[in-house]
Amino acid sequence: MPQQNLKKVIEILINNQSELPTIAVSGGIDSITLAVFISNQFKKQKINVAHAIGPAVPKEATNRVKKLANKFNWDLNIINTNEISDPRYIANPINRCFFCKENLYLTIKSYTKGPIFSGANLDDLSDYRPGLDAAREANVSHPFILAKIGKKIIRQLASNLGLGKLSELPSSPCLASRVQTGIPVTTNLLNNIDKMERSIKELIPNADIRCRWMLNNLSIQFNYPKIDTINSKLKKKITSKAIDIFSINDSTIEFKEYKKGSAFILSKEN
């Protein structure tokens, strides 16, 4: 069974280690579930959790991690990986995620000699994930991948662990993923994207949206609720918020159905 496989994988990974692993927890359901599973496995010890903060991390993700750390008695390290000062990251190339994860894992390795775990899952292997290359270089382990567990099983496991509605938490990559490839990533831009998405969620509770900063427009994409349910009155309110936050005019704002990875643009050479 998946749960037993995961337990065996973790036991093998920590065998003969002098320290418990540090789990890199972004605030998404994958890394949260891994951390809760491991904390249940080592109930008599505080597990080590690292959470990176910065302009690319939504504030709600950080708040979520802090609450869970208190609930499950994690030894939480809030770290600033400072990738926003890395010119390679700022340039926003197609492999931007590599530089983000490189900064993350180097920061974690600076304060622990123990193993580092990530919440990457089996489904991630079918997508372009340069962050996995950075993980490999830093000798980071991925228990879910080793146990052959994908997102669907993770959600089931989260439910079994008593995480309730969190088991249905929508996927939400970092805010930098909203910026079209090649457009420089800045603190101000990421803060505005976060502010815009939070404003929409205030108008539409539980909305699953992406505000993508594209070369020629701001693309507001709806996964939930569906775009055809957004009436003109609501669009007008959202447009007004966008004009105020980004200092743009309404002709550069579009409403679209969510499309995964639509801000990621491969170069013509590729």
Features from the language model and the residues they span:
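ATP-dependent adenylation/nucleotidyltransferase module used to activate substrates
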Residues: 1-160, 218, 233-249, 257-270
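A short, flexible beta-alpha/helix-coil linker loop
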Residues: 84, 180-182, 225-227
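A sequence-level detector of short, solvent-exposed, charge-rich linear segments
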Residues: 132-136, 177, 194, 198, ...
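A residue-level signal for beta-strand positions that form part of recognition/binding surfaces
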Residues: 137, 172, 252
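Mid-to-C-terminal catalytic subdomains of enzymes
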Residues: 145-210, 257
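Conserved active-site loop/cleft motifs that coordinate metal ions or position small ligands
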Residues: 210-212, 219-221, 253-256
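A short interface-forming secondary-structure element
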Residues: 215-234
